Amino acid sequence: MDYEHQTIITRAIIKAAVLMSEYGAESILIEQTAQRLGRALGVDSVEISMIPVAIVLTTLNHHQSVTTTRRVHHKPINMSIVCDIQKIVIAIEKKSYDVTYLLAKLKEIQPNYYNRWLVVFMVGLACASFAFLQGSDWVAFFITFLASSTAMFVRQELAKRRFVMIITFGITAFTATMISSLSQLNGISSTPNIALASSVLLLAPGFSFVNSFLDSLKGYLMMGWGRWMEGILLTIATSIGIIIAMAILNIKGW
C-alpha cells in the first residue's frame, strides 16, 4: 500500500468517525468503528484521539503512518446516521469492499427525520401525559399539550435557521412557560403548577448526560466532561428562559 492510498483510507475513516461524533454516538463505539474500518481496508492499526470539538486519527501500515485532524460540528442527535455507518462497516467486513465503496456510501447518508408534525404532536402528547400522571386536571392537560407542542414547533424552526443550541433552548423554554402560564393567570385550572413544570420536559438534555456518564466511565474523560458541560449549559439556558417568562408574568414559582 503506497502513501497516497493510505492517506485516502485515513480520510475516509475519519469522515465516518466525525459523522458518528456529530450525531451523538458513544465514544467507545466511534473508536471501535474506526479500528474495524482500518482492519477491513487493509491498514495494520488505527489510533484515534477525541475531544468534544475535534478528532485526531492516525493509520499505521508497515511502519508508515498518516495522521489527520477534523473538526466536529455538533448536530441534533440522530441514531439513524450511526446505524447506517455500522451497516456500511459490516458490509465492508463481509464482502471486502474497498475505500471507494466507503466514500460513496458516506456521501449517500442522509438524516432520517420523522415527519415534523408527528414529532410536534407526540412531544405535546408526551408532556401532557406526564402532567396527567402527576395529577393534573383536564384543563392543565390540554394547556400542557398546547404549550409543549408550540414549543417544539418553535424549536424546530430555530434549528432549521441554524440558531445556536443554547439560544434555541432558552427561547423554547420561554415560549412553553408563557403559554402554560395561561392555566395560572386566568385561574381556569386547579393544577397550574403541574402544567408549568410539564410543558418544558421536552428540553431535558438526558442524552448528553447519559453519554457523558458512559464516556467518563469507560475512560474517555475529555469527551465525558465536554458532553456533561453541554448538558449543563443547555439546562442553564432552559432555566433562564423559564425565569424570564415568569418574571414578565410576575409568577412566583411552581
Label the model's feature ranges.
Residues 1-97:
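Soluble N-terminal domains of membrane-associated systems
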Residues 113-186, 190:
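Core alpha-helical transmembrane segments of integral membrane proteins
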Residues 74-140, 230-239, 250:
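Alpha-helical transmembrane segments and their cytosolic membrane-interface
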Residues 105, 149-162, 208-223:
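C-terminal ends of transmembrane helices
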Residues 185-254:
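Generic detector of multi-pass transmembrane helix bundles and their immediately adjacent loops
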